[in-house]
Amino acid sequence: IANTSPSSIWLNLLGGVPLEECVGAGSGVKGTQLSHKYEVLKLSVEKFQNGFPHPSVNDIIRYFGGFEMVGAIGAMLRAAEKKMLVMVDGFIMSACMLAASKMYPAVLDYAVFGHCGDEHAHARMLSLMNARPILNIGMRLGEGTGALCAYPIIESSVRMINEMNNFENANITKYF
């Protein structure tokens, strides 16, 4: 709860997307609550920009991110350093990958995007990273549920590549 707020701000500041296009319902706020959320985030960004007229990526993530988000960025960067794939799932982890990609663009080479969630700015964030999620089923559940749905597809793909017969191994004659 509340991680869509820094994620929205990161999309605004790191992606150049107007804040009003970044702020969504998150865990389900509506109406005046959503308007209030936007106003609070707008004031937060204005206050930040007054103190940091030319912020670095580190300034942005330190000011607006929680320890769990900063930790996720570190894990993504370390995985890329080790040439390991990471499953990026949902709006918040996509925001972490966006931040990581601003520090080290090649981190995107090691990202598999599980799904595009129902948060309206998620698709915009994915497009900034040229990411194509495996699933786009409008979930807003959190807790890695998109990764759980996408993982069997990845596992099946790997098995097909590694275990499926080709024409030569199956002794099939080419007819052309």
PLM-predicted stretches and their roles:
Residues 1-176:
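N-terminal loops that bind phosphate or other acidic moieties
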